[in-house]
Every structure is written in C-alpha cells, then in structure tokens.
C-alpha cells in the first residue's frame, strides 16, 4: 500500500448480504466505465436474485455514488455520464436477464461438449434483434471464459479471443481488456480485428481455440489486402 492510498468504507442500515453484494457489483460496473480508473482488482461477480430490499438498490446506490462524488469528482463522475459511456454499455458487469443467462449457459455447454468430443471447427451462432443485449452477453461470456474458475479447464486447453471488426467497438473492448487485465493465454491480445487476428495466428504458428466473433455477418467475404491468406 502507498502512503497516498485511501479507503472508502460504505455502510447503510438497510444493508443485508444480498444488497451489499449487489452494491459491490454495481460499483464494479460503474468504476470499470470511468476513464480515470486504470484497473479493477476485485472482479468476482455475485449477481443476486430478488430479495427483501432489492427494490431499494437503485436509490441506495445513487445516494452512495453522490456521497462518493463529494469526496472525489474525478473518480466518481455524475451517474448519467457513466451510464452513457460506450464502455458502460458493453461492460461484462451488467446483471444479465434470465434469457441472457440461459443463452450464455447454452453456449458454454456447447463449447464444453465440443472440447470433450475433440471436435474442431464447431460453429455456434447467436441471433438477436438490435438492442436484444447481444453485446453485454458476449462481453460477459468472454469474461467468464477468461476468468471463471468453474470452467477454467476451457482456457487451460484453449486460447480465448474476441474478434471485432468495427473500430469504435474494438476500442471499447480494448479498454475493457486493459482494465480487467484480460489474458488470452497466448502471446496474442484478446480483442483483435479479423485480419490482425488471422495474420497473427499464421505469423506465430498458433492454432485458434475459442473465438468469439462480434457482428460476424459483417466480416468481409472478398479478399482483404491486409490479410496474408485467402478469403475469409
């Protein structure tokens, strides 16, 4: 610890275990979206279901955030600024809906089944309308594949990569990768552009493991001059 280190102790007379864990989760969600935050250290998520005081979460959290903002405005910006940031909207710390949880578990189970059977080239396609929550689902999936102890054997035996074609969205994921200290398991970065990823695999003689592709339908089908191989 440094002599300049500060600790904020947060308490409330309505706190119970579930509400406390939800407050912690939301703090990770908000702080990982703040530009001045370099690294989020405690990353164990504990999303809670409905409980006695769950309806007070929003109001209590806002009160806590405003109180923290009085102490450090650069670390705790106005809530609306945080919530409108691109990183916030793509953060893996969002509480998933039941549909998103079911989809994520289905994907993970299919990955496990494919690995167990020694299958290669397995394609898992996720479809959804714009605004259906695919971005948060994908972000949460990547974070689980990289960090969840329950499925750690997947990363132990496979490199994990996220392929993103859109420059702005790639910048968002690169920022998340930096703040959450994502590690693909290889010399490659986790989030990469398609041509960069394919060229890096070839250059480093690395075999792809589990690859999550964002907006896969937008990938080029024509030959790209920056790609050293054939069409993709």
Regions found by a protein language model. Name each.
Residues 3-114:
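Boundary/linker segments flanking structured domains
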Residues 6, 123, 159-162, 207-211:
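Beta-sheet entry/capping signal
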Residues 15-21, 170-172, 219-221:
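Switch/connector loops and helix/strand junctions flanking conserved nucleotide-binding motifs
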Residues 97, 104, 108-115, 127-132, ...:
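Conserved helicase motor core of SF1/SF2 NTP-dependent helicases
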Residues 118-125:
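Pre-Walker A (Motif I) flank of P-loop NTPase domains
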Residues 137, 141:
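Hydrophobic positions on the alpha1 helix immediately C-terminal to the Walker A/P-loop
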Residues 144, 148-182, 194-200, 204:
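AAA+/P-loop NTPase substrate/partner-engagement loops
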Residues 180-232:
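Conserved RecA-like ASCE ATPase "motif II neighborhood" in helicase/translocase motors
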């Amino acid at each position: 610890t440094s002599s300049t280190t500060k600790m904020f102790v947060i308490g409330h007379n309505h706190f119970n275990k579930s509400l406390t864990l939800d407050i912690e989760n939301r703090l990770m969600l908000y702080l990982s979206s703040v530009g001045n935050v370099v690294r989020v250290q405690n990353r164990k998520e504990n999303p809670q279901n409905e409980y006695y005081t769950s309806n007070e979460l929003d109001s209590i959290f806002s009160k806590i955030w405003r109180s923290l903002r009085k102490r450090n405005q650069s670390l705790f910006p106005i809530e609306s600024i945080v919530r409108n940031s691109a990183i916030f909207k793509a953060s893996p710390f969002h509480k998933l809906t039941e549909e998103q949880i079911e989809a994520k578990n289905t994907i993970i189970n299919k990955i496990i089944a494919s690995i167990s059977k020694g299958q290669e080239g397995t394609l898992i396609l996720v479809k959804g309308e714009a605004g259906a929550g695919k971005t948060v689902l994908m972000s949460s999936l990547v974070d689980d594949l990289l960090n969840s102890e329950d499925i750690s054997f997947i990363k132990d035996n496979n490199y994990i990569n996220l392929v993103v074609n859109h420059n702005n969205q790639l910048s968002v994921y690169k920022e998340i990768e930096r703040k959450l200290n994502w590690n693909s398991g290889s010399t490659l970065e986790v989030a990469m552009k398609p041509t960069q990823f394919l060229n890096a695999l070839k250059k480093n003689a690395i075999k792809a493991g589990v690859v999550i592709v964002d907006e896969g339908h937008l990938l080029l089908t024509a030959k790209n001059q920056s790609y050293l191989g054939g069409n993709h």
